[in-house]
Amino acid sequence: MCYSLSIQSSIDFHNRNALKIHGDRAILTSNLPTLRRIPFLPERDRRRKLVLCTGRVVNSLKFTGNTSVDLCGIPRHRLRVSCSDARRTPEETAAELTAQPNFSEFITSERVKVVAMLALALALCNADRVVMSVAIVPLSLSRGWSKSFSGIVQSSFLWGYLISPIAGGTLVDRYGGKVVMAWGVALWSLATFLTPWAADSSLWALLAARAMVGVAEGVALPCMNNMVARWFPPTERSRAVGIAMAGFQLGNVVGLMLSPILMSQGGIYGPFVIFGLSGFLWLLVWLSATSSAPDRHPQITKSELEYIKQKKQISTMENKRISTSGIPPFGRLLSKMPTWAVIVANSMHSWGFFVILSWMPIYFNSVYHVNLKQAAWFSAVPWSMMAFTGYIAGFWSDLLIRRGTSITLTRKIMQSIGFIGPGIALIGLTTAKQPLVASAWLSLAVGLKSFSHLGFLINLQEIAPEYSGVLHGMCLTAGTLAAIVGTVGAGFFVELLGSFQGFILLTAILYLLSALFYNIYATGERVDFDTTA
């Protein structure tokens, strides 16, 4: 069915209920296919009939949502709406499937509000992690801890992080991201808030508090992955992940930059109290303003909901809450090489991430002999770069897919940049003689690392959408084991060789090997997990 909007000299409605005037707008309403808002009618088109078919591009305008036509000075009596039964062409159908909302529509949509809240949660997640990376310097000095023992204290977070991702991913797949994320933020904020009292009680209480932070934060990324898969169509998921992970990296910046300031004002435990309370403020907004899926969101517009469903070609499984209590098919998941591609990539990502996050303040303090505030600043700059490049990578990834690049090739391009780039940059870091140069190399490494989020991280949703939560949990568990080895191993490695350089070179080589493995075995297509390899 095609609908024509003409500018006439008199009122002439074939379908009188199809056009309603509201202020300076004419709105097509009656039994129309979903059409997109036309922001204006150019002067040259005011005397030209515009045929509006769903998704069809006419005069470089795309129509997908409820149509609202600004009158732009056109007299109301010169508007006419008529309809015909013209058959839609394949080209029109294809155009409908590729029509994209403009930037203002995208940025004000409910799905972007949801991903913005996810970004804030991930920012708090990393801020609560990184506090100990700064606090460990004065703690180790005041209590006489060696570098190897400092590594063990920092790894206590990872021991907790090790046990929760698979269980958390399974819970996310069953109950949805809203509920599980709420519990996660509540628990890790409480544990962070109580850390000062735990530290004053005993070493074991401190280790237990940090382990509890790790347990609770293990659900954060599976929740993000699950909600992005439900709220965003494939052509927007890269940008959504880019926004969420930008918050993730900005949490590092906020934690590293604010912690020394808060320590100078409120003592060594000041940041733990402030960041812990911030989590509870976030929780109030999250519970009142979000839903696990778009079809359960009370404020989403009909046009946005239809757009999401149409672009996703949503299945029954994606539309309804997964209520089965069955055990996920771990054997079948592990029988496929694409699963191992994302597991290996996530393991290397976690190794590099936690080594840099945990050891860079100590690295700058001990190698370049800068004070704590300067060490925190040099360590924070790279994460600012990662937040910026992450969104650029997401935009570029979506653009490649919209222009016809296969999802598989797009993921491999992003992953290659995200691992080969840091590998080369870390080799450069070993040659730096000044802290400013070292921070520049580190910024390049961490900035390029963000491209891998548009490789392996989003790839989880594509190869196993029905198991994305549990698969992400499996990857995080493997990654946490790698992070424990890297974080603890770095301390022993430095004590054994007396230098950070050898460990940085080892990390660079592992990045390059992981990129090769991913390019050989990864795919962007859905994998059949109903049969074993």
UniProtKB/Swiss-Prot annotation:
It is a multi-pass membrane protein. Gene3D superfamilies: MFS general substrate transporter like domains (1.20.1250.20). Induction: Expressed with a circadian rhythm showing a peak during the middle of the day (under long day conditions). Keywords: Chloroplast, Membrane, Plastid, Transit peptide, Transmembrane, Transmembrane helix. GO terms for cellular component: chloroplast membrane. One of its GO terms (molecular function) is phosphate transmembrane transporter activity. It is found in: Plastid, Chloroplast membrane. The chain crosses the membrane at residues 117-137, 152-172, 179-199, 203-223, 243-263, 267-287, 342-362, 376-396, 417-437, 438-458, 474-494, 502-522. Expressed in leaf veins and root tips. Belongs to the major facilitator superfamily. Sodium/anion cotransporter (TC 2.A.1.14) family. Inorganic phosphate and probable anion transporter. This is Probable anion transporter 4, chloroplastic. It comes from Arabidopsis thaliana (Mouse-ear cress).
